[in-house]
């Protein structure tokens, strides 16, 4: 492991070994729904609350990663650590999920960038021989997030066109020193305040943080955007993606022909009632696991930059008219030759 520049790390022996994805009914009806390992038929998944549904989704993603690992191992594999994050207060879904597992646990929170944060931490630990198998995971549920950050689900208030619809999705993967896709570098983001106060327009506050991390990554690694086949962002959706491209172009970085935003793609914006697209920690966890990693394995892409985008929204601070800061973390995945 080598530190590169101010914020980046180059890895020598970190891989994604197994993965699993699960999504909700509306997400399954979207353009990438068929790529998910499993989908729900309703918002409860047999439980009596939305929170319990989200716990069940994240648990199932973890369980199936372990099942897949058992299928390729001669003996029952040991999970050395789990690193999870979600959008609920005190990352409640992650904490309650972990009650089932007698495994060391780190809970993380970078809002919708939590999944990439967990992968970065897991990669650092694997590189430093903390263990052989570390599970990273994240989730979101439309109804838990609406209640958490905006209004009660029964409120029924009107929303602006630039509003984003929280995806119901969960993903987990296993970071190891062997695997199918290599994780070659990462860039840890900084908290950026763009003086944005509208909790309905989170992509606007996330786009500058995303741009900052991309610029820092290219500078730290002395790289060009031409070195990457695809630039994947978490949940900027339609409007935030436009802002990101404009900011980067001002810095001489053109991603117009290679940008893929998970929030913009997880739904069909033109035919589904999702306003300007999707958001939530499950966006990047679901789409990365269900679609992007498989495209690398199949040889469609050689090198991909993936950026988790997190708006650090706090309802109390918003009620005090404080601006909403944001953070973005970045990893690079490469195909094995």
What are these regions (language model features)?
Residues 27-29, 93-95, 145-151, 242-244, ...:
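Short acidic, glycine/serine/threonine-rich loops at helix termini
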Residues 109-136, 175, 279-300:
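Active-site-proximal alpha-helical scaffold in enzymes
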Residues 87-91, 111-115, 140-144, 233-239, ...:
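Gly/Ser/Thr-rich loops at beta-strand to alpha-helix junctions
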Residues 9, 51-58, 62, 111-115, ...:
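Generic structural signal for well-ordered, non-membrane alpha-helical segments
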Residues 1-83, 87-94, 100, 209-226, ...:
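Conserved active-site "lid/cap" helical segment
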Residues 1-48, 152-216, 220-223, 257-264, ...:
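Condensing-enzyme catalytic core mediating Claisen C-C bond formation in acyl metabolism
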Residues 49-56, 79-125, 162-165, 171-172, ...:
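Active-site-proximal gating segment of KS-fold condensing enzymes and close homologs
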Residues 84-85, 134-140, 304-309:
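Short beta-strand segments
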